[in-house]
């Protein structure tokens, strides 16, 4: 009976000496019988090392926070979560002000700035997520490639050398090396002086996010919400 290598490598444990010995034996056998399979130019190696394609822009709906029925100046977190909820569960929130229903649930539980409250409300809708304080650009790329948006917390005021503020936006795609976002308050590119719709699909430079998202540009210091839900 032929074995399925998927099952073997799915359960591979590098801390299990038997697993390690088995892989080493497989390598010895390949060298003796099919040495070309272990070359960098081998087709399976090329396929294995190919990074998954990152989609252009995920179709995440846009909800501005500026028309929220209450606390419009401070409900960026709730409107961002509402956008992702409607992406994962289309039809849950009705109409262009659908995030009002979400905001109402948030304030029934706690405060909009409390990330644990957002986690609880999202889970109540059947969308699992977790808030992390150690994300980097590789995490954004991985999630986007899997078809999942990421909510991140940025410094939206001040200069790049001394950023200030605190704001939540939804990363929905990439354009080259830069990131496409839904910013519920408008666009940081115009200093939030234009219409709020400028935040829909706004392109934020990676070089800017390096200092507005990451702590002093250090990798794995970004705040954000990762979703476990499937589209």
For each predicted feature, which ranges?
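Catalytic cysteine-centered active-site loop
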Residues: 93-139
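Active-site-adjacent substructure of cysteine-protease-like catalytic cores
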Residues: 132-190
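Active-site-adjacent structural segments surrounding the nucleophilic cysteine of cysteine proteases
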Residues: 2-111, 175, 195, 200-201
């Amino acid at each position: 009976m032929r074995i399925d290598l998927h099952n073997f490598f799915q359960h591979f444990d590098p801390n299990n000496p038997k697993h390690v010995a088995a892989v080493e034996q497989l390598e010895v056998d390949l060298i003796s019988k099919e040495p070309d399979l272990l070359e960098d130019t081998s087709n399976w190696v090329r396929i294995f090392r190919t990074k998954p394609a990152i989609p252009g822009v995920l179709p995440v709906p846009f909800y501005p926070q500026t028309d929220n029925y209450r606390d419009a100046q401070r409900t960026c977190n709730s409107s961002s979560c509402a956008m992702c909820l409607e992406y994962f569960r289309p039809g849950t929130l009705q109409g262009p002000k659908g995030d009002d229903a979400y905001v109402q649930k948030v304030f029934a539980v706690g405060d909009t700035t409390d990330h644990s409250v957002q986690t609880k409300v999202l889970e109540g809708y059947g969308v699992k997520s977790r808030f992390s304080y150690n994300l980097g650009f590789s995490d954004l790329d991985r999630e986007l490639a899997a078809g999942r948006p990421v909510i991140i917390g940025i410094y939206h005021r001040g200069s790049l050398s001394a950023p200030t503020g605190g704001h939540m936006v939804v990363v929905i795609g990439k354009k080259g090396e830069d990131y496409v976002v839904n910013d519920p308050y408008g666009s940081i590119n115009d200093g939030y002086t234009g219409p709020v719709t400028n935040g829909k699909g706004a392109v934020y430079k990676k070089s800017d996010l390096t200092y507005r998202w990451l702590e002093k540009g250090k990798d794995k210091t970004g705040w954000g919400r990762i979703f476990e839900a499937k589209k």
